[in-house]
Structure formats: structure tokens, C-alpha cells
Regions:
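Asparagine-biased alpha-helical interface segments
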Residues: 128-132
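Single conserved hydrophobic/aromatic residue that forms the stacking wall/gate
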Residues: 166-177
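Outer membrane beta-barrel
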Residues: 1-79, 100-102
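Loop-centered beta-sheet repeat module
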Residues: 70-111
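Hydrophobic, lipid-facing positions within transmembrane beta-strands of outer-membrane proteins
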Residues: 3-5, 56-60, 93-97, 123-127, ...
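Outer-envelope beta-barrel architecture signal
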Residues: 13-15, 58, 66-70, 95, ...
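Transmembrane beta-strands of outer-membrane beta-barrel pores
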Residues: 21-25, 76-80, 103-105, 112-116, ...
Length: 177
């Protein structure tokens, strides 16, 4: 069974655009995390909400290579499978942006998302980073950290955080960011 259809394409040398049904608006984000796990709870690296990924949403994303290790991305997800429609007051719409920096052994990213429903607007911010040793297979682990804060307009502040120490003996196991 087909669970989603998407299309990603370049627009020049520095811009990539993606669009699709059942497509995460954060698909072209460069979240700074070296861990990739089998469960969403572990591999979201502490930014489960700011790195928006609604199921069954129509999505659009774009990434921009700024240069010198910097990248920016924007994304949108909308409730397109119901009568509520895209970008309506009744529908659920999420939009976000990310600024990231990556170097050979470390990276950082700042992610923003706004979830807009018919009753609540919730803003999330996520900050992530990682460092990997120059040589893998040593006793020194890779380190990934993440912190997220959410502020629903009708409740108190919501936070999540993440720390992982990963010891990898084969460099081919590292997630390409």
C-alpha cells in the first residue's frame, strides 16, 4: 500500500524544495543530532514538536544552503484530507523554520514551529547540538543534546530534553546530517 507521495527537487544550486501528501514539513531540516534510533521517542533528539512531523498532512518544505556550514529551512503542514481544508481557521496548520550550522565534528540547530488549530496556538522552540570525536572506535563517545520548550496559549510551558552518549566503532553507522 502507498502511504504517501512526495516530490523533492532542486531550484538552482542552493535551494531544494519538497512537497507531498503525508509529507513532513521538516523533511528538509538539518537537525543537529548523530543518533538515529528505531523509535521516535529516542531519535527525535529532544525536538519532537519543533521538528514538526504530523501524520496524514499535506506538507511543503524548502532548504537554503547559505554557505560556510550554515543552512536555513522552512516548512508547512496542513490538514488537507478533511473538509476543514488547508490554511483555514477550522483546519490544523503548522509552520516552522530552522537555522543550522555544521562542521566536520560538531553541529548546532535552532528550530521553531507554530501549531495553529481552531482553538489553540502553540509555539515550540528546539535547540540541538552534537559533537563527534575525530576518530571513531575509541573509548570517547559521540554526544548529542537537545532541549525543547513549548508555550501553548491556553496552558503552562511544556519542555523536553535529550542527552545521548553514543559509542560507535564503525563510522558508517553515523547518521549523515
Amino acid at each position: 500500500a502507498v502511504d504517501g507521495i512526495s516530490y523533492t527537487f532542486p531550484m538552482g544550486e542552493k535551494i531544494t524544495v519538497g512537497v507531498g501528501n503525508d509529507y513532513a514539513g521538516s523533511s528538509l531540516y538539518s537537525t543537529a543530532c548523530v543518533y538515529g534510533g528505531p523509535t521516535k521517542g529516542l531519535d527525535d533528539c529532544g525536538n519532537a514538536m519543533s521538528a514538526m512531523d504530523a501524520s496524514e498532512a499535506t506538507g511543503l518544505s524548502a532548504s537554503f544552503d547559505i554557505g560556510n556550514g550554515f543552512a536555513a529551512a522552512v516548512g508547512y503542514e496542513g490538514e488537507g484530507d478533511t473538509a476543514s481544508g488547508l490554511m483555514t481557521k477550522e483546519g490544523t496548520d503548522t509552520y516552522g523554520a530552522q537555522l543550522s550550522y555544521s562542521a566536520d565534528q560538531y553541529a548546532a540547530s535552532l528550530t521553531y514551529a507554530n501549531y495553529d488549530t481552531s482553538t489553540t496556538d502553540t509555539t515550540y522552540w528546539g535547540l540541538n547540538g552534537y559533537w563527534t570525536p575525530a576518530e571513531t572506535g575509541t573509548a570517547v563517545p559521540s554526544i548529542s543534546v537537545g532541549y525543547e520548550v513549548g508555550n501553548p496559549d491556553n496552558t503552562s510551558v511544556d519542555t523536553s530534553h535529550y542527552l545521548s552518549l553514543i559509542h560507535i566503532s564503525e563510522p558508517t553507522r553515523l547518521q549523515d546530517i
